[in-house]
Amino acid sequence: MRPLSVQGAWLSETRAFADDRGEFQELYSARSLRGALGYDPGVAQVNRSVSRRGVLRGVHFAQLPPSQAKYVTCLSGAVLDVVVDIRTGSPTYRAWEAVRLDDPHRSLYVEAGLGHSFMALTDDAVVVYLTSQGYAAGREHGVHPLDPDLGIAWPDGIEPVLSEKDRQAPGIAEMERRGLLPDYEECLAFRRSLCERGTG
């Protein structure tokens, strides 16, 4: 587990074991995650998406608490996966980091309170993500992924394909004005409570 530049985001790289029968790989290890985070976020739901080239999903997040941590793996094809610091008061507020996921040996962990988005770089890009909480429509929010205030460097030469919901999402300044973004100190307090309990 390697921490990324946005606090609360981690890159996990796992090994595969191959022989003449094929290959075996451990995609997710609660022990490894607990060792890095200090708590086990738990798995409440497993989601799978299949996207054609150019599909752009996000920037999504859920209200805190409990919000929704994600463990993201691209099983086939390729995506540019982006974590965004949308926590007001954070020293890296509005910062983002992009990771190309095109190998199931690499996964991205996105802590509760952070924003998450990805663009499919190929057709039939299959992404599986484990979430610490189930989907709760009334607590789900989004920031427009093409918001110039975020300035995410999506790949040139690929026309973004957005859902109507994501296309209508406000920019980060408007979300901050509405008071809908997570607060950094509240996120830290929530994280401390998880560490004290040892689980999400």
UniProtKB/Swiss-Prot annotation:
Residues bound to substrate are: R21, E26, Q45, V46, N47, R57, K70, H116, E140, K165
User: What Pfam families does its record include?
Assistant: dTDP_sugar_isom
Q: Listed GO molecular functions?
A: dTDP-4-dehydrorhamnose 3,5-epimerase activity
Query: What chemistry does it catalyse, as a reaction equation?
Result: dTDP-4-dehydro-6-deoxy-alpha-D-glucose = dTDP-4-dehydro-beta-L-rhamnose
Q: Could you name the active-site residues? A: H60 (proton acceptor), Y129 (proton donor)
Question: What EC number(s) does this enzyme carry?
Answer: 5.1.3.13
- Fetch the InterPro entries from UniProt: RmlC-like (IPR000888), RmlC-like_jellyroll (IPR014710), RmlC_Cupin_sf (IPR011051)
| Keywords in alphabetical order | Antibiotic biosynthesis, Carbohydrate metabolism, Isomerase, Streptomycin biosynthesis
Q: Name one GO biological process term.
A: polysaccharide biosynthetic process
Q: Which GO terms describe its cellular component?
A: cytosol
Question: What positions are marked as the site Participates in a stacking interaction with the thymidine ring of dTDP-4-oxo-6-deoxyglucose?
Answer: Y135
Disulfide bridges in this chain: none
Please name the pathway.
Carbohydrate biosynthesis; dTDP-L-rhamnose biosynthesis; Antibiotic biosynthesis; streptomycin biosynthesis
Role of this protein:
Involved in the biosynthesis of the dihydrostreptose moiety of streptomycin. Catalyzes the epimerization of the C3' and C5'positions of dTDP-6-deoxy-D-xylo-4-hexulose, forming dTDP-6-deoxy-L-lyxo-4-hexulose.
Family membership: Belongs to the dTDP-4-dehydrorhamnose 3,5-epimerase family.
What is the name attached to this protein's record? dTDP-4-dehydrorhamnose 3,5-epimerase
List the gene name: strM
